[in-house]
Amino acid sequence: MGLLECCARCLVGAPFASLVATGLCFFGVALFCGCGHEALTGTEKLIETYFSKNYQDYEYLINVIHAFQYVIYGTASFFFLYGALLLAEGFYTTGAVRQIFGDYKTTICGKGLSATVTGGQKGRGSRGQHQAHSLERVCHCLGKWLGHPDKFVGITYALTVVWLLVFACSAVPVYIYFNTWTTCQSIAFPSKTSASIGSLCADARMYGVLPWNAFPGKVCGSNLLSICKTAEFQMTFHLFIAAFVGAAATLVSLLTFMIAATYNFAVLKLMGRGTKF
């Protein structure tokens, strides 16, 4: 069997939905975590520079920002690991379905992988046999866990609900920055509003970013317009938008994972039909 035919047979059983969802998950998490981390840093600098001169006013905010940044590190690590596990589950379940119902045949690729895991031909040294045995045990344990798609359905469902809340929360800073940017546009083009320029303000206290006793806590008029024109404000605003898009992409990937895992579970346990997920 040629290499091309071998690859073609392997692709027949590839879980394409899981492959797409994994790529989307990695992209979304990287975008959300990377841009979100830098956007929080930019917000901290903007608050320190323009909205409050007293460190005690924004000390709690800085602690919250730093805590969120540490959570971002953990989120990135978890999702990259869990995405890889879900992809492995997709391959495992697809192979199981096709083996059970005769749609998936063992190829030279599978035989070669099996030989690699089990140590190959005789004549290997004891060190090579020990390494192969250890790898075989790891694969066996992983295979036993991957053999329960219902677990992945439950975990992914719970994770999707949690991430839905994260997605909603990621829209809050976008809303705040958009309101500030809209106010700046009204200041830049006074003909669009009947209010005086001096009364148009961005109040960080109104959104709970700063306590009500913070001074000045808000910026108005031409001072606010000058802030909106800074590269720091523009960059932070766009970073929050990118983080929001990343959260949306991650949510879509989780929904795709959940649908694929649920469908595979139903096929294996109830329907008895093959699937390409």
UniProtKB/Swiss-Prot annotation:
Assembly and oligomerization? Interacts with MAL.
Lipid addition sites, S-palmitoyl cysteine? 6-7, 10, 109, 139, 141
Family to which this protein belongs = Belongs to the myelin proteolipid protein family.
Where Phosphoserine occurs, residue numbers?
114
Q: Which GO MF term does the entry hold, naming one?
A: identical protein binding
- Keywords, A to Z? Cell membrane, Disease variant, Disulfide bond, Hereditary spastic paraplegia, Leukodystrophy, Lipoprotein, Membrane, Neurodegeneration, Palmitate, Phosphoprotein, Transmembrane, Transmembrane helix
Q: What is this protein called?
A: Myelin proteolipid protein
| Cytoplasmic domain ranges by topology | 2-9, 89-151, 261-277
Which top-level group of life is the source organism from? Answer: Eukaryota
Gene it is expressed from = PLP1
User: Per the record, what is the consequence of mutating residue 166 to G?
Assistant: Found in Pelizaeus-Merzbacher disease/X-linked spastic paraplegia; likely pathogenic
Cellular component aspect of the GO annotation = myelin sheath; plasma membrane; synapse
Stored InterPro entries: Myelin_PLP, Myelin_PLP_CS
Query: Where are the bilayer-spanning segments?
Result: 10-36, 64-88, 152-177, 234-260
Which terms does the UniProt entry file under GO BP? astrocyte development; axon development; axon ensheathment; central nervous system myelination; chemical synaptic transmission; inflammatory response; long-chain fatty acid biosynthetic process; positive regulation of gene expression
Q: Which medical condition is this protein associated with?
A: Leukodystrophy, hypomyelinating, 1: An X-linked recessive disorder of the central nervous system in which myelin is not formed properly. Clinically characterized by nystagmus, spastic quadriplegia, ataxia, and developmental delay.
How is it placed in the membrane, per its record?
Answer: Multi-pass membrane protein
Q: Which organism is it from?
A: Homo sapiens
Q: Which cysteines are joined by disulfide bonds?
A: 184-228, 201-220
Task: Enumerate the Extracellular topological stretches.
Answer: 37-63, 178-233
Residues with lipidation of kind O-palmitoyl serine: 199
